[in-house]
């Protein structure tokens, strides 16, 4: 089971938490999900140079709080906060609610699975050999302290006639261990030969009970 499912989804409520945290009345749920999807899509497109890892959304009353995790927060904030103010106005028009934006810096982008996946995809689009791009991502993550890394690419690799899947792994990857802190990222590279899917798994160590309680005191 651990080999097949999204490793973050499998660990929700154990060592991982939800990216959208809100409660909706009956009839509003679908609307909020659609809104969340639109917000994430808009921010990812507008801030793609900033290296967006993930976007957490919280709602309370007429207020929407967005927590944006970025590798380059300076691009999001802009000079004297000009960019973030403009962004806030655009988002408030979209959701018709007050929007609060909190920018969090991703201190080690080499250990963030989503950013590693996007970096590998960018190299594939620039026609870097897929094996070299994958091995480069793995060695970089291991150098920064990952206990295990697995990168998988699927599609017409190297312009081959028949699509196939290749993967490389270094270190441990205990997908069945629920207390294992495994980060997962997925993206697609649009090459001249077609779309290549890139999946990245990064194992950062095991989260013990005391660590979980410290991170989530209400649990």
Curated annotation (Swiss-Prot):
InterPro entries reported for this sequence: KH_dom (IPR004087), KH_dom-like_a/b (IPR015946), KH_dom_type_2 (IPR004044), KH_sf_prok-type (IPR009019), Ribosomal_S3_C_sf (IPR036419), Ribosomal_uS3_bac-typ (IPR005704), Ribosomal_uS3_C (IPR001351), Ribosomal_uS3_CS (IPR018280)
GO molecular function, one term: rRNA binding
CDD domains cross-referenced by the UniProt entry: KH-II_30S_S3
Protein name: Small ribosomal subunit protein uS3
KH type-2 domain segment(s): 39-107
Pfam families xref list: KH_2, Ribosomal_S3_C
Keyword line: Ribonucleoprotein, Ribosomal protein, RNA-binding, rRNA-binding
Domain of life of the source: Bacteria
Cellular component annotations (GO), alphabetically ordered: cytosolic small ribosomal subunit
Database matches in HAMAP family: Ribosomal_uS3_B
Organism the protein comes from: Desulfatibacillum aliphaticivorans
């Amino acid at each position: 089971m651990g080999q097949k499912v999204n490793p973050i989804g499998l660990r929700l409520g154990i060592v991982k938490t939800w990216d959208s945290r809100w409660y909706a009345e009956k009839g509003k749920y679908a609307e909020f999900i659609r809104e969340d999807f639109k917000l994430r899509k808009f921010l990812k497109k507008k801030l793609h140079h900033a290296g967006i890892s993930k976007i957490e959304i919280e709602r309370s009353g007429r207020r929407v709080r967005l927590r944006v995790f970025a590798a380059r927060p300076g691009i999001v904030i802009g000079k004297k906060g000009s960019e973030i103010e403009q962004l806030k106005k655009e988002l408030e028009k979209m959701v018709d609610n007050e929007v609060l934006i909190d920018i969090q810096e991703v201190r080690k982008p080499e250990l963030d699975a989503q950013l590693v996946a996007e970096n590998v995809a960018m190299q594939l689009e620039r026609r870097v050999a897929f094996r070299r791009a994958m091995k480069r991502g793995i060695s970089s993550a291991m150098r920064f302290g990952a206990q295990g890394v697995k990168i998988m690419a699927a599609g017409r690799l190297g312009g081959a006639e028949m699509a196939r899947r290749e993967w490389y792994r270094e270190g441990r990857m205990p997908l069945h261990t629920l207390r294992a802190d495994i980060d997962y990222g997925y993206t697609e590279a649009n090459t001249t030969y077609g779309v290549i899917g890139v999946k990245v798994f990064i194992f950062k160590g095991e989260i013990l009970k005391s660590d979980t309680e410290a991170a989530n005191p209400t649990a």
